[in-house]
Swiss-Prot record:
Cleavable signal peptide: none
High-level lineage: Bacteria, Pseudomonadati, Pseudomonadota, Gammaproteobacteria, Pseudomonadales
Species in which this protein is naturally found: Pseudomonas tolaasii
Keyword Cytoplasm: yes
PANTHER family: REGULATORY PROTEIN RECX FAMILY PROTEIN (PTHR33602:SF1)
The protein's name: Regulatory protein RecX
GO biological process: regulation of DNA repair
Amino acid sequence: MTVVLDTLVAVRRTAMDLLARREHGRVELTRKLRQRGAEPEMIETALDRLTEEGLLSEARYLESFVSYRPRSGYGPARIREELSQRGLQRADIDLALRECGISWQSQLEDTWRRKFSGHLPIDAKERAKQGRFLSYRGFSMDMISRLLSGRDLDD
């Protein structure tokens, strides 16, 4: 059953349904509404109105995203990249990452312990494997090097 988004009311209702599930950024919401067949002019009008009413907020979306992604083991570089791909401004992303109150070193250690059971690499191959995984997850090489050398562990 396909919903036809040919009226402003239908576009608004669909946008509100999406926002009821979780926060969305404007670019992401626009993309989803276009995929459902809504006209660009109606999308802009509906989203402008939702923004005026406080139902669509980039700041809330940033805060929500930055609070839940680290719990999945992702670091600041990966989160920054994902938010950039979703059309958010780099300055806003950097501000949200600074103000989130997350200890990225602790997050790195938690992610490493979950994946590698807290075992430091015994050879270059294992060190490279652990480093690649943590780098892909969005942690800086400086932080990873300190961790894998055993300098930051508080066991």
